Amino acid sequence: MLVLGLLVAGAADGCELVPRHLRGRRATGSAATAASSPAAAAGDSPALMTDPCMSLSPPCFTEEDRFSLEALQTIHKQMDDDKDGGIEVEESDEFIREDMKYKDATNKHSHLHREDKHITIEDLWKRWKTSEVHNWTLEDTLQWLIEFVELPQYEKNFRDNNVKGTTLPRIAVHEPSFMISQLKISDRSHRQKLQLKALDVVLFGPLTRPPHNWMKDFILTVSIVIGVGGCWFAYTQNKTSKEHVAKMMKDLESLQTAEQSLMDLQERLEKAQEENRNVAVEKQNLERKMMDEINYAKEEACRLRELREGAECELSRRQYAEQELEQVRMALKKAEKEFELRSSWSVPDALQKWLQLTHEVEVQYYNIKRQNAEMQLAIAKDEAEKIKKKRSTVFGTLHVAHSSSLDEVDHKILEAKKALSELTTCLRERLFRWQQIEKICGFQIAHNSGLPSLTSSLYSDHSWVVMPRVSIPPYPIAGGVDDLDEDTPPIVSQFPGTMAKPPGSLARSSSLCRSRRSIVPSSPQPQRAQLAPHAPHPSHPRHPHHPQHTPHSLPSPDPDILSVSSCPALYRNEEEEEAIYFSAEKQWEVPDTASECDSLNSSIGRKQSPPLSLEIYQTLSPRKISRDEVSLEDSSRGDSPVTVDVSWGSPDCVGLTETKSMIFSPASKVYNGILEKSCSMNQLSSGIPVPKPRHTSCSSAGNDSKPVQEAPSVARISSIPHDLCHNGEKSKKPSKIKSLFKKKSK
């Protein structure tokens, strides 16, 4: 009875007199009391009529409905702040935002109130009874727990306690006894989460998932693909840039190695030049010693000759003649040995200066190529340093990867490397070629007096002027060799001083002074006029004067070469030049098959040069040369700056060959003054024999050591007239020695 009275009193006060943790016991006790004493309950029926569960519509008959009603009353009290029995719009909005922690409560608020602005407990109960959540089964509740609450670990506890939709209001009010003791949820955060989710479905109905947005999925997929593709592209570009940079660094290292090898090669070049200078000094010392010996032999011969001339007795004169003859024989043997050591013919001294000038011009072109290669190297280094600086910044790697600067720098490095390689190959080939030329010729080419001195000495007597371009280093010949061959007139016709030469010297130098081509064709009459001084008839051994040609200006296609100020107006064609050349050569050929000079003439004539064997036998001439002939020969030799020196057989040299002429091996070739260049360094022969050192000209040494008064007497002994060559008089060695002996004895 006491418990029943308490229930009635609690119902009058809104069922809040009994604590929540005792409500289960009260319900259980009231049910037991009602079952045990139905008579008492029947006696108190007016009191039960005031129970709110029975007064509600629809009424609550079961225990679960009672628990649900109590939970709804608790929720209504929490939302009703002013305790007026109704939930206004402001109160529900504040509860949704603060207690349920919803930021956007518009949809929830409209779903809760609908058209009713004042919600009472009866309205809340009716909505709960008609709600879909109220009719949830155990499976629906478990699905809600797993999918929406996301607490699948409590599925077993819900299943054991048979939690259905009608039990959710008890979870929404957070009964500790029910949540902890029955559902066994010990985690506070899980209890709070479960309470908020249960309160949501009790007040606002079941949660509905929004429709699946395929556009978002597509956009997300495309974004993922783009992101992955961008990452892959960035990775590949970074890898490619690193490979490019590594390759560039490797090329730069190889470039530095090539530069170092070039420096080493230049050091070797300097050492080789120093060795060449030392060899030249030693060579000069040997030549000086040989000249001393020759001068001593000449003095001894002169002394014996003076003794022979001053002797009165025939016997003493014969003895002196025999001694002199012995000296001549010794000198002749020595000359023959030297002639055997030398090649078949000698080259004039002017070729040495022309080769030295060619070497200096080639060195200047090499220096220009070297400067260009060094400039390319500096540019490549600067670009590589810029790339390094760019890669050190934050966005430098991406900038370098997406730009074409790496390819450009790589191309510049390869170009600089190629230029250095070509420069090194050119330097090696040039060094080897000029060393071989020096070995074959037997004189210095790389070590010379310099380009200004060579230019002034070789172009001092010329009437045409060469003006180089500004961009090219100063050198006398602005065009190539082919340009000079085609544009310049024949050298013989340009200089009138060469026409006053004796026929012997003319014939000897005609093959060297002949031009390869003619520029302007001429008529037969001027050609015959030009043939006369170059190919003299045997009946006219000397021509004192020559036809004069009117100088005219010759236009040149090369802007670097100025017009010729004085040159003949008409030039010979190739046929007439060949006729002059062969007519001049035939004067040197003597039809004597038994002599040694015949074989030499046949081999030397094929090489387009005068026979050198006549130099040896010029000393054995039975005829004396007068002072007028010697002076005429010297004057003609001084007037011609381009022809070969005629003093091959010096009066004081006793048949020695001229020491300033070049020595060529049989394998060497000379094509009209142009040095043939080898196509490949591998084809160059490294076994070319080194010629003997040259000797200074005997005639020059004799002129320095002897007074001027002794020249006629010496010439009478050792010189041969040019008429011997023109008339074809030639004999063997024994006959010449005997005739010399007879003449001298007289």
UniProtKB/Swiss-Prot annotation:
Annotated spans, Disordered: 483-562, 685-746
| Keyword field | Calcium, Calcium transport, Coiled coil, Endoplasmic reticulum, Glycoprotein, Ion transport, Membrane, Metal-binding, Phosphoprotein, Signal, Transmembrane, Transmembrane helix, Transport
Glycosylated sites? 135
Subcellular location as annotated: Endoplasmic reticulum membrane
Q: Where is the EF-hand domain?
A: 67-102
Point to the regions of Basic and acidic residues compositional bias.
723-732
Q: What is this protein called?
A: Stromal interaction molecule 2
Source organism per UniProt: Homo sapiens (Human)
For this protein's source organism, the top of the classification is:
Eukaryota, Metazoa, Chordata, Craniata, Vertebrata
Q: Which gene encodes it?
A: STIM2
